[in-house]
């Protein structure tokens, strides 16, 4: 199968390496020309995935028209806030893309202002194509190194082709499941970044394992409540796109969102951390989007609300914890 991966951050690069390992034809298209030149010359993404060389079978591209002409599947590996711009760029080069059957997003976040999920943004800009979301508990470097993992591919309007893509993505080191609950896996993948910031705050405050376990348990309950209120299926959040992604991102030392929260718990300011970060901390903007949605819909989300106060009102993490611990008592 022929894949085009647009976006050469850590995850886009890692997934390109995975596809190459499965002997697919794959072209990596960095969004910046200078990045494309750097990767082509060194065969390594030194900015986002250092130490992991790209196999020679991976093609590097920058001109979209010839890449899209050959692609069966386009994978958009860019941050959620850059997704619309990337889709508009793709749209301008789709005239000869006669083989394209599916566009898949790897983004985990909501578009600021519209509160749209990644697949909704893609569908708004590229309405003539089937759209899917690929998500789950995956660290980019581990996938690139071929360590075993599992993901879930959610899509509609694909028919039998979805199972073909599922088989093409799966291999000895990656098992891919499918679902039609696109909303569920996208809400799960987005919300877990918010709760990873909370988990990081707990780590930064050195509160221990009991606190982390309680936090993750209540975060999962809140994730289900928010997701179902927004139209997702409850059972989706107990799978790879919900609970699985939540556990990995809230406990992994590699997690940008958890690390961001840890520094907050240690006393750093969000603005300083964001200014110093080379990679996108998706949970920061996602918190703002979900806080707005929950307020509009009257959804009870106390953990999310306290993270919003930490990030946007400067509330000390220790005070946010006290607010959560002293809420009215209730049945589980």
Kindly label every feature range from the protein language model.
Residues 1-52, 59-62, 89:
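NAD(P)+-binding Rossmann beta1-loop-alpha1 motif at the extreme N-terminus of oxidoreductases
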Residues 9, 13, 33, 61, ...:
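Electropositive phosphate-/nucleotide-binding environments in soluble metabolic enzymes
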Residues 52-59, 99, 127-129, 172-174, ...:
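A short helix-to-beta-strand connector/capping loop
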Residues 60-69, 73-148, 165-167:
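Rossmann-like NAD(P)(H) cofactor-binding subdomain of soluble oxidoreductases
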Residues 82, 93, 121-131, 148-197, ...:
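Internal alpha-helical scaffold of NAD(P)-dependent oxidoreductase catalytic cores
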Residues 192, 199-203, 228-238, 242-332:
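NAD(P)-dependent Rossmann-like dehydrogenase/reductase catalytic/cofactor-binding core
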């Amino acid at each position: 199968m022929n894949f085009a991966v647009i976006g050469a951050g850590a995850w886009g690069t890692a997934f390109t390496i995975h596809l190459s390992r499965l002997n697919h034809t794959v072209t990596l298209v960095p969004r910046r020309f200078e990045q494309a030149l750097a990767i082509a010359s060194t065969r390594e993404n030194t900015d986002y995935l250092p130490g992991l060389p790209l196999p020679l079978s991976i093609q590097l591209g920058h001109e979209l028209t010839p890449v899209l002409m050959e692609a069966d599947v386009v994978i958009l590996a860019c941050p959620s806030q850059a997704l619309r711009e990337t889709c508009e760029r793709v749209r301008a080069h789709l005239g000869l893309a006669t083989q394209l059957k599916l566009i898949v997003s790897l983004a985990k976040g909501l578009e600021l202002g519209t509160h749209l999920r990644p697949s909704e943004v893609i569908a708004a800009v590229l309405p003539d194509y089937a759209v899917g979301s690929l998500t789950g508990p995956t660290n980019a470097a581990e996938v690139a190194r071929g360590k075993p993992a599992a993901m879930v591919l959610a899509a509609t309007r694909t028919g039998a082709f979805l199972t073909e893509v599922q088989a093409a993505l799966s291999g000895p080191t990656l098992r891919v499941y499918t679902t039609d609950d696109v909303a569920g896996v996208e809400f799960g993948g987005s919300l877990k970044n918010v709760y990873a910031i909370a988990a990081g705050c707990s780590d930064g405050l050195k509160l221990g394992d009991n606190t982390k376990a309680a936090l993750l348990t209540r975060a999962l309950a809140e994730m289900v409540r928010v997701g179902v209120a927004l139209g997702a299926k409850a059972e989706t959040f107990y799978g790879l796109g919900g609970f699985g992604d939540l556990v990995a991102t809230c406990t992994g030392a590699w997690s940008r969102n958890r690390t961001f929260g840890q520094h907050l718990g240690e006393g750093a300011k969000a603005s300083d951390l964001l200014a110093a970060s080379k990679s996108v901390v998706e949970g920061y903007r996602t918190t703002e989007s979900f806080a707005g949605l929950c307020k509009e819909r009257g959804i009870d989300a106390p953990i999310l609300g306290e993270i919003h106060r930490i990030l946007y009102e400067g509330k000390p993490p220790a005070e946010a914890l006290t607010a959560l611990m002293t809420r009215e008592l209730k049945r589980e």
